[in-house]
């Protein structure tokens, strides 16, 4: 059994910060469960172009408002607390945060915890 608190990882090696977001990676590859789980804060007024070429990601919005755009189809979906979206086909997408957002993210395969986005908005496989 793994029991961990958010406070256990704050300001540690799995707490990744950028101008647009903070990713607090609570469960990582070292835990051996096949996925990673992140508590992510997205800053109001930010736009992020992302494309996870090597991972499937599910995102559950628990606070805030914004939108996600599928850059292949042009479809735009509103995001607010209680909304989930999954990037099951590695879609390039744009996240726009209208307010500060808090999102629970699940990645498979699991991230090791220290990854940062490359120039394409992806992580290495």
Where are these regions (language model features)?
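A short, N-terminal "cap"/entry segment at the start of jelly-roll beta-barrel domains
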Residues: 1-35, 49, 115-125
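Short beta-strand His + acidic residue motifs that chelate non-heme Fe in jelly-roll/DSBH
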Residues: 48-50, 68-69, 87, 92-98
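A short beta-strand-loop-beta hairpin characteristic of the jelly-roll/cupin
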Residues: 53, 58-81, 91
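Short strand-connecting beta-turns/loops that link adjacent beta-strands
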Residues: 31-32, 73, 100
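Ligand-binding loop in jelly-roll beta-barrel domains
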Residues: 89-114
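Conserved short histidine dyad/triad with adjacent acidic residue
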Residues: 36-53
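Conserved GNAT-family N-acetyltransferase fold
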Residues: 40, 59, 85
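Tight coil/turn sites that cap or link beta-strands
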Residues: 43-45, 81-82, 88-90
């Amino acid at each position: 059994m793994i029991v961990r608190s958010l406070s256990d990882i704050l300001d540690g090696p799995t707490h990744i910060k950028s101008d647009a977001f903070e990713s607090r990676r609570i469960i990582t590859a070292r835990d051996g469960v096949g996925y990673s789980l992140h508590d992510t804060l997205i800053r109001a007024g930010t736009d992020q172009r992302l494309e996870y070429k090597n991972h499937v990601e599910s995102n559950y919005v628990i606070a805030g408002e914004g939108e996600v755009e599928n850059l292949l189809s042009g479809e735009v979906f509103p995001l607010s607390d209680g909304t989930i979206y999954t990037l099951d086909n590695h879609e390039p997408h744009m996240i726009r945060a209208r307010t500060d957002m808090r999102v629970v993210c699940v990645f498979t395969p699991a991230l090791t915890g220290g990854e940062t986005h490359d120039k394409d908005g992806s992580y290495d496989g």
